[in-house]
Amino acid sequence: MADKDKKVKKKKAKEDAPAEEAPAAAAPAGDRQSSRGSRKAKRTGSNVFSMFSQKQVAEFKEAFQLMDHDKDGIIGKNDLRATFDSLGRLASEKELDEMVGEASGPINFTQLLTLFANRMSGGSDEDDVVINAFKTFDEEGKIDSERLRHALMTWGDKFSADEVDEAYDQMDIDDKGYIDTTKLIAMLTASAEEEEGGEAA
């Protein structure tokens, strides 16, 4: 009977040992790999945040929240369409597809920052940033002054009505309420250059 007990114990130990050893050996390797991958992903995300000031990140966050119409934490094609609609501009399916296609995956907040960082590191200078910002409002070389006023008083560093009025006093606005885009950009970029020149002196 003792021999039988020994055989059963030996058999049981033999069956249990490989089953316990295999997962134990496989688990740490899998854990190490996934934790390394997640740490790398976290580092990549945090590198994007370090490219911007806290104020800029807060402004991007505000813009992201305004664009995320369905509040699911991801900007999709419908969110982009609704954003353009709220600006009074119709975006074609092709434009929307191209915008969504620029991202390497779903556009969450970190992905949005990454897209901006890629654009900014792509050699865009301040003038290009200004020009691209006004393309959203540009209607064949003109900007509707009321739409621009609304945007200036609603998004980002919100301007007061007095501040917008003061800026509009310096702009050339036609009888129909349109601002010449080229003149506006020239005025803004010249003002920025004057400020930089004044700081250097």
Curated annotation (Swiss-Prot):
Positions contributing to Ca(2+) binding: D68, D70, D72, D79
Keywords, ordered alphabetically: Calcium, Metal-binding, Motor protein, Muscle protein, Myosin, Phosphoprotein, Repeat
Residues found modified as Phosphoserine: S46
Gene3D superfamilies noted in UniProt: EF-hand
Compositional bias of kind Low complexity: 20-29
PROSITE patterns xref list: EF_HAND_1, EF_HAND_2
Annotated region (Disordered), positions in chain: 1-48
Domain EF-hand: 55-90, 125-158, 159-194
Segments forming a coiled coil: none
GO molecular function: calcium ion binding
Subunit details: Myosin is a hexamer of 2 heavy chains and 4 light chains.
Designated name of the protein: Myosin regulatory light chain 2
Annotated organism of origin: Bombyx mori
Lineage, highest ranks first: Eukaryota, Metazoa, Ecdysozoa, Arthropoda, Hexapoda
